[in-house]
């Protein structure tokens, strides 16, 4: 009964935090529209559409896979198994996301010219491509923290991510973009990318602190690669 109540309050906290962050994000979108104008917003929406497509491909179902496999290991009390799951998920995510990132990087001129129709978006697309593996590795850690029930820490990091994203974006818009739509797109993508890096580093730091407190005991190795592929590939 106690565990059920904890799960309920964790889900409630995560839902409430996500709603609050979405409201803040909507307010920030209003600010952006006033800063970069209709032309900048139009270009930004096109860049974000391409980015979301690439991010979906780069994730390759790894966030859900990390959450599912971590939950299995935590439920069985296999703490070394959790380490193996995270290692396998990191390797899978890095390879998958790097392949997609390279594709976006080298196809960015074609996408900017033929699909978006504006070469000013080229730099923004390449900034996104450079940080795509960081975003996807952050997805692995998010899946782990969700499965491990460490919702409060996850919410705190998500709030930090939002603050960093807005702060870096505002800084770049006010001191560098100077009303240029192409630079404005770079500012927004750059702010989001910097926030993703902060998120990944924060979650890795929290995970390292947890690792130092785990019991040191022998466990029979449980195969991870096959389980990961069975879960991740259908979601890719």
Identify the residue ranges that each predicted region occupies.
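Membrane-interface junctions at transmembrane-helix termini in multi-pass inner-membrane proteins
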Residues: 135-157
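Small-residue-rich midsections of specific transmembrane alpha-helices
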Residues: 45-71, 93, 130-136
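Helix-terminus/linker motif at the lipid-water interface of multi-pass membrane proteins
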Residues: 23-41, 112-114, 176, 236
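N-terminal membrane topogenesis motif
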Residues: 1-24, 80, 84-87, 220-235
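Alpha-helical transmembrane segments of multi-pass membrane proteins
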Residues: 117-141, 167
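Short membrane-interface helical motifs at transmembrane helix boundaries
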Residues: 99-117
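Interfacial/gating helices of multi-pass transporter permease domains
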Residues: 32-53, 120, 185-186, 226-231
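Membrane-interface helix-loop junctions in multi-pass transport and translocation proteins
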Residues: 148-153, 163-206
């Amino acid at each position: 009964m106690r565990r059920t109540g904890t799960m309920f309050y964790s889900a409630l906290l995560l839902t409430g935090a996500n709603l609050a962050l979405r409201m803040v994000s909507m307010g920030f979108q209003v600010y952006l529209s006033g800063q970069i104008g209709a032309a900048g917003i139009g270009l930004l929406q096109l860049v974000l559409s391409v980015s979301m497509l690439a991010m979906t491909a780069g994730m390759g179902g790894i966030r859900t896979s990390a959450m599912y496999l971590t939950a299995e290991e935590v439920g069985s009390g296999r703490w070394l198994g959790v380490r193996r799951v995270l290692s396998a998920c990191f390797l899978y995510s890095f390879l998958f996301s790097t392949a997609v990132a390279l594709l976006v990087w080298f196809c960015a001129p074609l996408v900017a010219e033929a699909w978006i129709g504006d070469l000013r978006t080229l730099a923004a697309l390449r900034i996104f491509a450079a940080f795509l593996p960081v975003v996807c590795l952050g997805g692995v850690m998010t899946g782990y923290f969700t499965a491990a029930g460490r919702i409060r820490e996850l919410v705190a990091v998500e709030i930090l991510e939002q603050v960093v994203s807005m702060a870096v974006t505002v800084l770049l818009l006010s001191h560098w973009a100077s009303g240029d739509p192409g630079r404005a797109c770079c500012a927004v993508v750059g702010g989001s990318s910097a926030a993703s890096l902060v998120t990944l580093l924060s979650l890795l730091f929290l995970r390292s602190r947890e690792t130092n407190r785990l019991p040191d005991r022998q466990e029979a190795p449980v195969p991870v690669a096959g389980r990961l592929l069975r879960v991740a590939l259908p979601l890719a």
